[in-house]
């Protein structure tokens, strides 16, 4: 038993004080003595040896607060002494360096012949490479930060109520801005006097059809004989598009009706309800002198999109142009 324990100490017998070896029965065979005669004495001697060796082993592992490296016994089991793999494969591992736990009490190291103390079955922190220790610290810090993020501060009932009220205010403001935008869009689309206000979907459909209609009017080239000059205004004023164009294209004018009507009975629109919207018109003074000239114009006819039997906007745009003979 004593020979196996001394294999763990590089200094061998020099490590122990000389007073320990002065006892007569240190190297004697204890099995030759009769345990019935001196059983109490044998038990006391064995306990004293275990305590002394545990104290010496602990002092050797942590001398002056520094962890000293111990080489494992050759007869130790590989699975008991194999340290867990730490660090990258390219870094050297000190697989044979072990030390005792600093917090282990004296005499707390169980021992059996043929196996090292249990404190030697764990690798010492001092033998790890600097890169491995740094990665371990970084991993611990990252785990602590993640745990702190997962822990959410418990809000009080007053704070929750305040957050709900702020969210409701933001939602009301958002809906109010959307409603204001649709009201502005409805004011620019020529519509019939509906009994109820158009929904958002119907307003968007009318706006799409009306925008396509105006785009076709602006981009269409209607050849007219001669260079026309133009323009007739309306009650609400007019806006010119493109100015005088070369060739036979006449000047196009978009008239913005603001719903004002002349009170004069001679007005052809006298008595009709005001219709806000736009119209496109042009005039050619040279063609006014000629007879039997057919002039065409595409007319925008707003319809109620809520009617099931109403025409689609594609059909409205594809209607044949309005014709009249001057």
Curated annotation (Swiss-Prot):
Pfam family, one: HLH
Keywords carried by this UniProt record: Cytoplasm, Developmental protein, Differentiation, DNA-binding, Neurogenesis, Nucleus, Transcription, Transcription regulation
Function: Transcription factor implicated in the cell fate determination in various organs. Binds to the E-box consensus sequence 5'-CANNTG-3'. Plays a role in early and late pancreas development and differentiation. Important for determining whether cells allocated to the pancreatic buds continue towards pancreatic organogenesis or revert back to duodenal fates. May be involved in the maintenance of exocrine pancreas-specific gene expression including ELA1 and amylase. Required for the formation of pancreatic acinar and ductal cells. Plays an important role in cerebellar development.
Protein name as catalogued: Pancreas transcription factor 1 subunit alpha
Subunit field text: Component of the pancreas transcription factor 1 complex (PTF1) which is composed of TCF3/p75, TCF12/p64 and PTF1A/p48. TCF3 is responsible for the nuclear import of the p48/p64 complex. Interacts with TCF3 and RBPSUH/RBP-Jkappa.
SMART domains membership: HLH
UniProt key word Cytoplasm: yes
């Amino acid at each position: 038993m004593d020979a196996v324990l001394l294999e763990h100490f590089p200094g061998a017998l020099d490590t122990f004080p000389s007073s320990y070896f002065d006892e007569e029965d240190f190297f004697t065979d204890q099995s030759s003595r009769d345990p019935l005669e001196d059983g109490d004495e044998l038990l006391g001697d064995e306990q004293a040896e275990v305590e002394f060796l545990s104290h010496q082993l602990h002092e050797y592992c942590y001398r002056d607060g520094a962890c000293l490296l111990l080489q494992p016994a050759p007869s130790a089991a590989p699975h008991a002494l194999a340290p867990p793999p730490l660090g990258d494969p390219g870094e050297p591992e000190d697989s044979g360096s072990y030390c005792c736990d600093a917090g282990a009490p004296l005499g707390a190291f169980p021992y059996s012949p043929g196996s090292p103390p249990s404190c030697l079955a764990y690798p010492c922190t001092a033998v790890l490479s600097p890169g491995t220790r740094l990665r371990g610290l970084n991993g611990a810090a990252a785990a602590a930060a993640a745990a702190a993020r997962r822990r959410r501060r418990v809000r009080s009932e007053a704070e929750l109520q305040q957050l709900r009220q702020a969210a409701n205010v933001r939602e009301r403001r958002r809906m109010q801005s959307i409603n204001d935008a649709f009201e502005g869009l409805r004011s620019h689309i020529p519509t019939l006097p509906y009994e109820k206000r158009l929904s958002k979907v119907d307003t968007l459909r009318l706006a799409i059809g009306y925008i396509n209609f105006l785009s076709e009017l602006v981009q269409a080239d209607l050849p007219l004989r001669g260079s026309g000059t133009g323009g007739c205004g309306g009650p609400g004023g007019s806006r010119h598009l493109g100015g005088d164009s070369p060739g036979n294209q006449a000047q196009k004018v978009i008239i913005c009706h603001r719903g004002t009507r002349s009170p004069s009975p001679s007005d052809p629109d006298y008595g009709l309800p005001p219709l806000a919207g736009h119209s496109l018109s042009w005039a050619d003074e040279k063609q006014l002198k000629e007879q039997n000239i057919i002039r065409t114009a595409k007319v925008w006819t707003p319809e109620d999109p809520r009617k099931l039997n109403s025409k689609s906007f594609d059909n409205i745009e594809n209607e044949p142009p309005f014709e009249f003979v001057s």
